[in-house]
């Protein structure tokens, strides 16, 4: 019996066009350009999930450094002092303290200074 591939092709085209919904112009209407746009966007999203982690770590370090310097300690000395004091707060929490709880961060900085001297 002869097999016609119209159903499979239609399903595949529909899948890509559904994923391209919301794109502008031919990218949401034409199968080929929609497929290219979707494949590229999937590649970008995969890459950028990795990049996001790096970017947030950079942001946290930047915020901790700024707050530590306001309290008279550099970032590297601050982190080293925390290790000496046995305080195991991650950079995300430290950055949050630096932004939202300045007094508590200042207390941490004083503790670090005492451990470093």
UniProtKB/Swiss-Prot annotation:
Question: Which GO terms are recorded in the biological process aspect for this UniProt protein?
Answer: ribosomal large subunit assembly; translation
| Transmembrane feature ranges | none
Which controlled-vocabulary keywords does the entry list?
Ribonucleoprotein, Ribosomal protein, RNA-binding, rRNA-binding
Q: Which domain of life is it from?
A: Bacteria
Q: Which GO terms describe its cellular component?
A: ribonucleoprotein complex; ribosome
What is a single molecular function from GO for this protein? structural constituent of ribosome
An example of a Pfam family matching this protein is: Ribosomal_L20
Its job: Binds directly to 23S ribosomal RNA and is necessary for the in vitro assembly process of the 50S ribosomal subunit. It is not involved in the protein synthesizing functions of that subunit.
What family name appears in the similarity comment?
A: Belongs to the bacterial ribosomal protein bL20 family.
Q: What is this protein called?
A: Large ribosomal subunit protein bL20
